[in-house]
């Protein structure tokens, strides 16, 4: 079995670092997802995001995602999930997921599933900071998150 590289950090995320961590000589693929701060939302100019987490639970949830990934795609080798906390300016990465596998199909499918699951289950919250005169800032509820009102309104529990 491969390794899981999980990290919550206030430092800038390094895509090269996580790629190097998950690369393996038996693998023909490393699939990466890099989530970045975009400069707009709902017609408002976003200048940065502010992330907070319940860190112990977030790491536990990230580890559970890795266990689920390995159950669904048995040939995955290494998995890396790094999430930034604190201030994340526009264009910078807030989350990086990297997965190595002997074949690209499994790695690509697993990365897509992992980001969707991360958004659903990991207790990380973001606040959007808007340009001056556009409402200052707003905490955002992730509609995919299983404890959110939007999720509960659209799913039978």
UniProtKB/Swiss-Prot annotation:
The keyword Cytoplasm applies. CDD domains: MoaE. It is found in: Cytoplasm. GO terms for biological process: Mo-molybdopterin cofactor biosynthetic process. Keywords: Cytoplasm, Molybdenum cofactor biosynthesis, Transferase. Its main location: cytoplasm. Its EC number is 2.8.1.12. It comes from the Eukaryota. It holds the Pfam family MoaE. Pathway: Cofactor biosynthesis; molybdopterin biosynthesis. GO terms for cellular component: molybdopterin synthase complex. InterPro entries: MoaE_sf, MOCS2B_euk, Mopterin_biosynth_MoaE. Belongs to the MoaE family. MOCS2B subfamily. Heterotetramer; composed of 2 small (MOCS2A) and 2 large (MOCS2B) subunits. This protein is produced by a bicistronic gene which also produces the large subunit (MOCS2A). Catalytic subunit of the molybdopterin synthase complex, a complex that catalyzes the conversion of precursor Z into molybdopterin. Acts by mediating the incorporation of 2 sulfur atoms from thiocarboxylated MOCS2A into precursor Z to generate a dithiolene group. This is Molybdopterin synthase catalytic subunit. The lineage of its organism: Eukaryota, Metazoa, Ecdysozoa, Arthropoda, Hexapoda. The gene is Mocs2.
């Amino acid at each position: 079995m491969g390794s899981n590289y999980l990290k919550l950090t206030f430092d800038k995320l390094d895509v090269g670092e996580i790629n190097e961590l998950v690369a393996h000589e038996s693998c023909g693929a490393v699939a990466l997802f890099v989530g970045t701060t975009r400069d707009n939302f709902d017609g408002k100019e976003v200048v940065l995001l502010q992330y907070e987490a319940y860190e112990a639970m977030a790491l536990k949830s990230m580890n559970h995602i890795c266990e689920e990934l390995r159950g669904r795609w048995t040939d995955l080798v290494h998995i890396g999930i790094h999430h930034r906390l604190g201030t994340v300016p526009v264009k910078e990465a807030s989350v990086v997921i990297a997965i190595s596998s002997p074949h690209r199909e499994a790695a690509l499918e697993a990365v897509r599933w992992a980001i969707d699951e991360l958004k659903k289950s990991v207790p990380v919250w973001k606040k959007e900071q808007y340009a001056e005169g556009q409402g200052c800032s707003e905490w955002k509820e992730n509609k995919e998150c299983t404890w959110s009102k939007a999720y509960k309104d659209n799913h039978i529990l």
